[in-house]
Amino acid sequence: MDYRFQRRLAAEILGVGESRIWISPDPELREEIEGAVTKADVRALIKRGVIKVLPEKGNAGHASKVRHLQRRKGRRRGMGRRKGVATARLDPKERWMHRIRKIRRYLRYLRDKQVIDRKTYRRLYMLAKGGTFRDLASLKRYMADRGLVPEEKIR
């Protein structure tokens, strides 16, 4: 029951892959199928429904849908699931907001306590806005290096 030749012809005729060709397993049709050696013979078998095209398989996607729903509920997001550094999972804008708010809060504190004047506050504020300071520590270093604030006033 070797129908490789007929399968190849049917695949050519129907324009699909050989794996999608279904040939009837009926033993009574065996000789007739084996005798089909021309494209015309195979076409006749296709017309009679002895040879058919199987539907495409495709990807089910069910597992990924279930995973997605679980993640929406907050599952599968624990420490053991995480790869990469913590900052890789943080939105860059979110990181920027945390950083700039901390720096601005500190600058406001210094201005309100009159440790720095309005002019210095404004200059440092604009530098912070421009991304000059990587974190609060770098702002404090900057102020200490330039003597903008006495050492003991930098808390």
UniProtKB/Swiss-Prot annotation:
Q: Can you list the GO cellular component terms from the UniProt entry? A: cytosolic large ribosomal subunit
Question: Entry's SUPFAM superfamilies?
Answer: Ribosomal protein L19 (L19e)
* Keyword annotations: Ribonucleoprotein, Ribosomal protein, RNA-binding, rRNA-binding
Q: Where is the composition biased (Basic residues)?
A: 66-84
**Region ranges (Disordered):** 66-85
Q: Which CDD domains match?
A: Ribosomal_L19e_A
| GO terms, biological process | translation
Q: Which family does it belong to?
A: Belongs to the eukaryotic ribosomal protein eL19 family.
Q: Subunit structure, per the record? A: Part of the 50S ribosomal subunit.
Q: By what name is this protein known?
A: Large ribosomal subunit protein eL19
Annotated source species:
Aeropyrum pernix (strain ATCC 700893 / DSM 11879 / JCM 9820 / NBRC 100138 / K1)
Q: Which gene encodes it?
A: rpl19e
